[in-house]
């Protein structure tokens, strides 16, 4: 057993996206910090409707996957394929942009708390131009596995025999929401083949003598085990792991490809109305 250590701490930065939705961006911030194959992680949380009510009007994507996990609130997804999905508290929308998708995510509430995450996962070159896809995962489809000192909500991958609704795929992702009691330790094997990113959003965790506070992401190094100890107030954190692609990444806004020429083609396709054909 080799326990992973934190290689890099990424401080989440205030940002806005869509039509002015306020959020905290760790991966994918202005300095383009990434953790292959993870391109971006945004966290949003507010009870002020001015921070979120304008939502994310219609916009394009190409070349990667987006995962929206809503802790609290209600959003409506619509796309050019005719998909329409209500994302409610505890639910997930897993969207594969592939060769192209044009979609919107709009709040369906005028007050109350809106809280959640959006994660971008890169696709390998061979899959960047595959047909777009969309999956709406309701809260009741996502299992929670209790253990002595907390619980794990399993969105993707498997935790101690509990399988999440998302399995396999080119990067074989793990996406866990871990709740850990104060002063207790979460220890679990993570495939040595996978990159690992830990993101606490409540409380703090200590990993091999380094502390991650809320909205500080930790890129962990090589090994096959993660060991995280909750601080005095307990902790809730995301465990994100996946196989690195080790391919060139060229990004321009909502397009993520392997070369500048492919980005230029994506822009032309969008301008000519054929991005998502």
Regions found by a protein language model. Name each.
Residues 1-277:
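Jelly-roll (double-stranded beta-helix
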């Amino acid at each position: 057993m080799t326990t992973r250590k934190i290689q890099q701490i990424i401080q989440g930065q205030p940002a806005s996206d869509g039509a002015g939705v306020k959020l905290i961006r760790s991966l994918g911030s202005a300095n383009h910090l990434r953790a292959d194959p993870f391109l971006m992680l945004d966290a949003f949380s507010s009870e002020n409707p001015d921070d979120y009510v304008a939502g994310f009007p219609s916009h394009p994507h190409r070349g990667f996957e987006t995962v929206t996990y809503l802790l609290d609130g209600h959003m409506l997804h619509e796309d050019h394929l005719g998909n329409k999905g209500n994302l409610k508290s505890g639910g997930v929308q897993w969207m594969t942009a592939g060769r192209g998708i044009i979609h919107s995510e709009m709040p369906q509430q005028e007050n109350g708390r809106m809280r959640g995450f959006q994660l971008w996962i890169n696709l390998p070159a061979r899959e960047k131009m595959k047909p777009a896809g969309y999956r709406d995962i309701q809260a009741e489809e996502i299992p929670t596995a209790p253990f002595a000192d907390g619980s794990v909500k399993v969105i993707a991958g498997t935790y101690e025999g509990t399988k999440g609704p998302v399995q396999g795929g080119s990067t074989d992702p793990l996406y866990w929401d871990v709740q850990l009691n104060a002063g207790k330790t979460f220890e679990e094997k993570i495939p040595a083949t996978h990159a690992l990113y830990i993101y606490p959003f409540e409380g703090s965790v200590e990993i091999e003598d380094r502390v991650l506070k809320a909205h500080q992401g930790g890129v962990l190094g090589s090994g096959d085990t993660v060991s995280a100890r909750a601080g005095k107030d307990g902790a809730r954190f995301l465990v994100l792991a996946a196989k690195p692609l080790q391919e060139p990444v060229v990004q321009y806004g909502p397009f993520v490809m392997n070369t500048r020429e492919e980005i230029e083609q994506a822009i032309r396709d969008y301008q000519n109305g054929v991005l998502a054909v």
